[in-house]
Every structure is written in structure tokens, then in C-alpha cells.
């Protein structure tokens, strides 16, 4: 899947400078969590949506808000509950008694970075309301289509399914996420650093730092990422990996019982986009096979 105009060295250098500035911005608010930071960068560069699973309190919300602040984007947080309605997410028509007309009130999904907190505590009907937004980057209210801003990134968090009050996400919803990542607790040294910064007032939000870049910078980075070169042989290797999940008994024998459903073509697209973004993060303008090894579990979880 070669590119006619692959990203050049100057573009990769420019990308590295911008990403370094974003990383420094995140570092003020998020201690450790290197895997989470990389996942955020992949989502930012590709526009692919992220599903993060962990127990509460591991900086998921903080990281999402910090990322929005780093790029100068609009941030919206939606707390998912069993009584949350689709209109609470996408918006609705409100009757204006003074004009005698219905007016459109856009919902919180019309932001650059949207956090769906504890998505698996909402009902399936509400979860499905996000499908059009996540895939088509648009919403429909009262028969009128509204385009979502660019860039647009959904970060959803979920608690482990065995916790009380959680619902299983349907396959159609899961398939919209580029990456699912499971976060772990910080180490003792990182937790001590959190307390040190707390005492020093580092986390105070009275004077938030200036954005590290602009939304136009993000759109430029996304364009650069799409032009990262992938050799046709590496693309074939990718397809073989994805195909193996559909013929699990042939490749992994007894372990096939743990695969409920093979990866869809959307997984191949996610693989391709994420591997290009990872190459850019690593300072390369081409993809190498080890990128797929690094991304296999998160993109197909």
C-alpha cells in the first residue's frame, strides 16, 4: 500500500517537535502512564477512537481533558448512567415559546475530544447513539445533519465488566474503537510523585498552561501520518495477521476457544492507521513489521 508522496524528513521533524510539546503539556497533569500517553498520541494522529478499561481513579478523565487543553480543542465529558438518553449526547430540538419555533440544541458530542465516562453503565440504546458520530463524524437531529468538528476523537472509559451496574458493549460498538487498552495502577514511585505534585500545587487549574499546539497543527499531523509509507509486503503481512483471527483453530489450536469472533476489515484499517502513526511517533517515515507486533493486542482487543 505505497504512498505517492511519502512524508519527508522535514515533516517528520516538524511532527516530532509538535508531539514533544504535547507530551510536555500532558506531563504536567499525568504522572507515569506511558502506555496511556502513547495511546492518546495514536488516537490524536489517526482520529481513531479509544476504549480505556480500568478501575476508577487512574487519570483517564484527567488525561482526556489535558489532551484537549494541549491542542487548544473543545473538551466535553459525558457521564454515562442507566438513565442517560441519546438526546443527552447528540442534542435535540427545543421549543422556543417566544418565537413559536423549534430550535436545535447541539449535544456535548459536538466537541473535539469527547470523553464517554463509564460507557458500559449506559443502556445499549444510548450506546448506539454514538455509532453515527463515531463512524460518520456527524449527527442527525430532527432530520438535519450536523458535521462534527475536526479533529474529532472519542475516548470511552469502562469499568471491568464484573463490577456491579455494568452492561456488555455490543460488538457493533466495540468495532468502532481503534484501540482498547487496559490500564494498570501506578507504581509506588509514581504515586509518591503524584502526592509531591499535589502538595506543590502543580495540579491547580486556576492557571492552566497555554496550548502546546493548535487544531490546525493536529490536522497537519494527521495528514502527515496518512502519508507514512507501507511496503506492499508489510500490508500482506498485516492481512495474514487479521485473517488468522478468522481461522483461529488452524493457527492456534486449543487457544481458538478464546476467540469469539474474528477481526473485521475495520481492524485491518485500524492496524494500518495505527502503525503509520506509531512510525511517526518513533521518528520514521515508513512502517516496519515490529509495529504490528506492538499494536496487535490493543487494536484487536
Where do the protein language model's features map onto the residues?
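Loop/turn-to-beta-strand initiation segments
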Residues: 48-49, 111-112, 149-155
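AAA+ ATPase "lid" subdomain C-terminal helix
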Residues: 230, 243-250, 271-287
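Pre-Walker A (pre-P-loop) alpha-helix and adjacent loop at the N terminus of AAA/AAA+ ATPase modules
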Residues: 16-49
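Conserved small/polar residues in nucleotide/adenosyl-binding loops
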Residues: 293-299
